[in-house]
Amino acid sequence: MRVFEGRYYGEGLKIAIVISRFNSAVTKELLDGALDALKRHEVKDENIDVIWVPGAMEIPHITRSIALKKKHDAIIALGAVIRGETYHFDVVANEVSKGIAAINLEVDVPVSFGIITSDTVEQALNRAGIKSGNKGFEAAMVALEMANLKRQIEAI
């Protein structure tokens, strides 16, 4: 029996981070967490591309464009969608989630999901590492694991 499991090893990996500028107080924390994880696991600065987009709705479009180029081993999608007083939150959260899921099925480049959905700014900041855990760090770890697992599967 053979068992395949991704590793948290970044040497030689090229990673793209697509990040929303909207809610930047939160997304900058997510970016810091993702960069911390990548650097701790040997991904060199010159192998990290950070692409800023206006808002969460633009993340899937640019993520797909980058994935289709197949120049990165994994892509990390980072953003923060915070509930307001209208139905807009539900639309944005659902469409961004569906968009990233579709890219993962369509294009052969793993995309990790580091998009926070929360009811308040305080909740979003907490999930971005202000109190504990950083979803950007976690998304980067998923990207490393999936990139390495993909390499193993390709070698079968």
UniProtKB/Swiss-Prot annotation:
Recorded catalytic reaction(s): these are: (2S)-2-hydroxy-3-oxobutyl phosphate + 5-amino-6-(D-ribitylamino)uracil = 6,7-dimethyl-8-(1-D-ribityl)lumazine + phosphate + 2 H2O + H(+)
Q: Show the GO cellular component annotation of the record.
A: cytosol; riboflavin synthase complex
The record, for InterPro entries, names: LS, LS/RS, LS/RS_sf
* Keywords for the protein's UniProt record, in alphabetical order: Riboflavin biosynthesis, Transferase
Q: In which residues is (2S)-2-hydroxy-3-oxobutyl phosphate bound?
A: 85-86, 127
Which Enzyme Commission number(s) are on file for it?
A: 2.5.1.78
**Binding positions (5-amino-6-(D-ribitylamino)uracil):** 22, 56-58, 80-82, 113
Q: A GO term (biological process) for this protein?
A: riboflavin biosynthetic process
Q: Where is the active site?
A: 88 (proton donor)
Q: Which residues form a coiled coil?
A: none
- UniProt entry tagged with the keyword Calcium: no
Output the Gene Ontology terms for molecular function.
Answer: 6,7-dimethyl-8-ribityllumazine synthase activity
Q: Which Pfam families match?
A: DMRL_synthase
**Role of this protein:** Catalyzes the formation of 6,7-dimethyl-8-ribityllumazine by condensation of 5-amino-6-(D-ribitylamino)uracil with 3,4-dihydroxy-2-butanone 4-phosphate. This is the penultimate step in the biosynthesis of riboflavin.
Q: Which family does it belong to?
A: Belongs to the DMRL synthase family.
Name recorded for this polypeptide: 6,7-dimethyl-8-ribityllumazine synthase
Instruction: Report the source organism.
Output: Kosmotoga olearia (strain ATCC BAA-1733 / DSM 21960 / TBF 19.5.1)
